[in-house]
A protein has these predicted regions:
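Lipid interaction determinants
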Residues: 29-84, 91-137
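Intrinsically disordered, low-complexity peptide-like regions
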Residues: 12-15, 30, 86
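Generic short amphipathic/hydrophobic targeting helices enriched at N-termini
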Residues: 9-11, 23, 32
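Bacterial N-terminal signal peptides that target proteins for export
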Residues: 5-19
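Bacterial N-terminal signal peptides
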Residues: 20-28
Length: 137
């Protein structure tokens, strides 16, 4: 009988240690999966001279960000618009303005699990991908 209880105790100890390791790995993975708000320098690095592509309000788009502050957006339906973009270094926000806009539209850029998101106070996070260079079509 003593032999059985020692054997069970040993198995219990192994299972307990294994569960602890699994829990520790789970907690560590959660810590690494936190969203990060990009700085103005990081926003500039990913956008400047590159194209963002994704879906905005259900419409597929490609938007190029030229180093001179010009931005071109082309949607899947063929709609094309040329505007301006810049970065507010104090608030670390991306800003854009298109013909007809009264004010600059501001968005935060977030990174979560190596994916980028546009984030504002009024819209849910919207995922986008970066294409290197000018890739509007």
């Amino acid at each position: 009988m003593l032999f059985l209880s020692r054997k069970f105790g040993y198995k219990f100890m192994i299972i307990r240690n294994l569960l602890f390791i699994v829990f520790a790995l789970f907690v560590a993975s959660l810590a690494n999966a936190q969203s990060v708000k990009l700085t103005s320098i990081q926003i500039s690095e990913i956008l400047n001279g590159n194209t963002a592509s994704g879906k905005w309000d259900g419409e597929v788009y490609n938007q190029y960000f030229d180093a001179d502050g010009t931005t071109i957006i082309i949607k899947a339906d063929g709609f094309e618009n040329i505007g301006k973009w810049k970065i507010n270094h104090e608030t670390e926000e991306f800003l854009s303005k298109f013909p007809g806009d009264i004010d600059w539209q501001s968005l935060y850029v977030m990174e979560y699990l190596s994916e980028f998101y546009w984030v504002s106070k009024t819209t849910p996070p919207t995922k986008f991908k970066i294409k290197i260079g000018k890739k509007l079509k």
